[in-house]
Amino acid sequence: MNAPKFRPLKFGVTRVTLRDGVPGTHYLTAEQPLQPFAERMTDRLQHWAKTKPEHSFMARRVKQADGTSGDWQHITYAQAWQTARNIAQGLIDRGLNAERPVVILSENSLEHALMGLGCMLAGVPFVPTSPPYSLVSVDYDKLKHVLKTVTPGMVF
C-alpha cells in the first residue's frame, strides 16, 4: 500500500509573545511581520476564477435513490464565482444588510457554501444554523433564540 504524498506546509506564525490583560484576558502578538494577504476571502475565489476557471473548486458525491454514493458533482472556480455574484446581487436587491442577515438553515452542501460566498460578496452577515434545530426539536427553543437574536431578512 502506498502512503499518501504530502507537500510541506509553511505556517505563517511560529513565534508569539503573550501579554496578560485584565484578569482572564490574554493577548498574543505575532513576532513575525504579517505577509501580504487578500483583503477579503472572496478575493482568492475571484483570482482562481480568472486564473484557472475550469478547475474544480468544490465537489460532492451525489446520493443515489438506494442510498449509495454516485458520481461526483463538481463546481468550477468560474461557476462558483458567477453563482456567488448572482446570489450577492439578489441579496442586495432584496435589501439584506447587517441588520437583516441571512440564516442558513440547511445541511452542509454546495448550495450552502455558495450562499455563504454570495453573502460575503454582498457584505451581508450569514448565520449557519444547525438543521436539527428545526428538524428534530420538539419545542424549537434553540431555533427561536437564533431567529430572535439575529432578526434575519432571509432564511435559506
Predicted feature descriptions by range:
Residues 50, 92, 120, 148:
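Short polybasic/polar patches that bind polyanions
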Residues 97-100, 125, 153:
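Short acidic/polar active-site loop segments enriched in Thr and Asp
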Residues 33, 54-115, 133-144:
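Conserved AMP-binding/adenylate-forming core of the ANL superfamily
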Residues 117-128, 149:
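Short hydrophobic alpha-helices that are characteristic scaffold elements of the AMP-binding
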Residues 51, 122, 153:
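Phosphate/oxyanion-binding loops and surfaces in catalytic or ligand/nucleic-acid-binding neighborhoods
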Residues 20-31:
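Short, contiguous pre-domain boundary segments
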Residues 2-19, 36-63, 82-84:
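A short N-terminal helical cap/helix-turn-helix that marks the beginning
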